[in-house]
Swiss-Prot record:
CDD domains: bS6 (cd00473). Keywords: Ribonucleoprotein, Ribosomal protein, RNA-binding, rRNA-binding. Binds together with bS18 to 16S ribosomal RNA. GO terms for cellular component: cytosolic small ribosomal subunit. Residues 97-147 are annotated as: Disordered. Belongs to the bacterial ribosomal protein bS6 family. It comes from Nitrobacter hamburgensis (strain DSM 10229 / NCIMB 13809 / X14). Pfam families: Ribosomal_S6. One of its GO terms (biological process) is translation. HAMAP family: Ribosomal_bS6 (MF_00360). GO terms for molecular function: small ribosomal subunit rRNA binding; structural constituent of ribosome. It comes from the Bacteria. This is Small ribosomal subunit protein bS6.
Amino acid sequence: MPLYEHVFLARQDASSQQVEELTNQITGVITGLGGKVTKTENWGVRSLTYRMKKNRKAHFVLLNIDGPAAVVSEIERQERIHEDVIRYLSIRVEEHEEGPSAMMRKADRDRERDDRGGGFRGDREGGFRGDRGPRRPREEAPAVVEE
């Protein structure tokens, strides 16, 4: 059977529980039509590049699907009708990616970066150019003597 990667975006004001129920509903449709979901990833609420249907953020969910084309057309039809789904995209792939997806690896990398602390150039002391050492003493101007 063909392999698909399917991503859908749910509205930001939908709760995590509602998104989980929507994911389970879609998974039920897939298994009911003879397909199977090999991996499900919830990427959480992320900012959108531009507004979609008056939303600036959305819940992102990835499904790896192994099933006939009729499965994909049916879940896309149901997502078109569902009011919580903003966008969806299904892509046919040659093989599914093993392990976490690129988005999950990026999230892990960002968490590691936050754990290091310090922010931008946190290892440096001082201001813009780091610690430059003490200033040299100022040379005094010669005193003007009036006669």
